[in-house]
Amino acid sequence: MYLTRKLKLGKTDQLDRLARRAGNLWSTVAKWHWRFVDRQGYWLSKGQAQKMHCKGVDGLHSQSAQAVADSFYDSLQSWRKKRDSGDYEGLRPPYKQKRYFKVQWKSAAIKLRDDGVLRLSNGRGNDPVLIDWPSDTKPKRVEIGWDGSQYKLRCQYEVEEDQEPKGTKTAGIDIGEIHLAAVYTGDDSWTFNGRELRSLRRQQNRTAARLDSKIDRKEYGSRRWKRLVQAKDRQLGKIRSQIKDLLHKHSTRLVKTLHERRVGTVVVGDLTGIRNGLDYGSKANQRLHQWAYGEFVRMIEYKARLHGMTVKRVGEAYTSQECPSCGNRHKPHGREYICSCGFEGHRDLVGASNIRKKYLGQDSVRVAGEMASPTGVRYRPHMRCNPASSRKAACQWQGCRPVG
């Protein structure tokens, strides 16, 4: 299994030169690909483009040059799939020239020296990129790109799923907006409060609207216009980081709690396609399209696998409407689910219970009587889910700088 780490590198002349060379190569690959299409009606393959343009590129490792062509053709292939499926309205193929582009290094160009310095080769006769490395693990792949204010390194490294699940329990998880996750294991239940995430989304929308109104009143390209655009990018980037931090901390807390409670299988409601064909009004649509359920579920999945747990997805159809006790269906009103059979329970926990039951089979034991109140988990900005040693390592990752 591969994980990704990120390092902030600042801005250096060497990284500017590398990004410029990668941008020039991207522009060359794109220009000649579309020239062949327009003049000869022929689509170059990735291998043909690499033979034509990626050999002996000055200042770039051969595999870094090949990775630029890979990126172009991956983007092109993605567009062609969208076109073939008919779902490509407003999408255009990659054709624009790029002044700068991300630089990628594959395993053969990466070396971790004994003195703790990561060496990224740029080919024979060129100065390598040297970075103080806060880990004794060599990454399999490294990518350096511009994030709007500085260069950021992203690396992939292999980790072993060496932890075994402590038990064989099955947990059902219902993903929501007011409650980011409702979890039911049959014995225990929790709800993870999502109101802080909603607050950050509102702040994000207000900030974007406020700055957009100021930007629209300035002359395009003027000094004041540029400053406002930079301020918008900076402020929205900070909010995006806060949202990602919240999702990481909640998902880590959730998975560790399940591992401690001897859960071996995690069943998550599949919300794929939930946005398709829905129209609840402008504000509700905005909340729905900003709902980060996909990213949150992906975090749960890979963190659960690291703890040896199996993750499954099942459809969520009618899981919030079906009574866990008698099986009758009706739409609940408010946050409590009340059935005519006498069953009462938290609305989101009813969904989590039915997701779990759907995976285990319809003949599993039904919930009788009243469902116990769940344990609530609320986000705090200072909440930490890792031990002190891990926090120290995380700080080291954030503080890395290039050598020299």
Over which residues does each language-model region extend?
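Positively charged, low-complexity nucleic-acid-binding target-recognition regions
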Residues: 13, 160, 285-287, 291-404
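Phosphate-interacting basic helix/loop segments used at nucleotide- and nucleic-acid interfaces
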Residues: 153-164, 237-259
